[in-house]
């Protein structure tokens, strides 16, 4: 796992997804060296960088050109990227041109979540996996409901990570924002 502190970050681009959350996403995805992964809403590229080390191909999509730039910088910093394609476009537009995917991770949908999930469903390989991360309650509900309509059996977990800061007289736990991880396998 890459260390959160090693990522290049900017104020204008969210991320990276915290290390513990990336670890859960990797576990839930059951990624193999033969998998083709799509990362929708790549932000600073935390998910992209982790999958680039483990999958055959990663396609990373973001509407924000700064996000694509920071993701590229992080890939270069970690000597990754030979198997990564970066696309600066909306998720729904970019996904229409991708024909093969085993794993789709949606970390940012730009209010297009239902459309994005429909397109992913139509292109996801048999036994493919979908993972949606969400901090907004509305996004969690929207993802669950849409996946159910698409005949998936989604599972949801909400993760609250706290990290300790060592002080002179003890350890203080500092909480991160809770995040939901919604996962579903194609039947």
UniProtKB/Swiss-Prot annotation:
Entry-linked Pfam families: Methyltransf_31
Pathway(s) the chain acts in: Cofactor biosynthesis; adenosylcobalamin biosynthesis; cob(II)yrinate a,c-diamide from sirohydrochlorin (anaerobic route): step 8/10
Catalyses which reaction(s): Co-precorrin-6B + S-adenosyl-L-methionine = Co-precorrin-7 + S-adenosyl-L-homocysteine + CO2
EC number: 2.1.1.196
Superkingdom: Archaea
InterPro entries: CbiT, Cbl_synth_MTase_CbiT, Cobalamin_biosynth_MTase, Methyltranfer_dom, SAM-dependent_MTases_sf
GO biological process, one term: anaerobic cobalamin biosynthetic process
Molecular function GO labels: cobalt-precorrin-6B C5-methyltransferase activity; protein methyltransferase activity
Alphabetically ordered keywords of this record: Cobalamin biosynthesis, Methyltransferase, S-adenosyl-L-methionine, Transferase
Gene3D superfamilies in the record: Vaccinia Virus protein VP39
CDD domains: AdoMet_MTases
Enzyme class of the recorded protein, top EC level: transferase
Family: Belongs to the methyltransferase superfamily. Archaeal-type CbiT family.
Name of the protein this chain belongs to: Probable cobalt-precorrin-6B C(15)-methyltransferase (decarboxylating)
Organism of this sequence: Methanobrevibacter smithii (strain ATCC 35061 / DSM 861 / OCM 144 / PS)
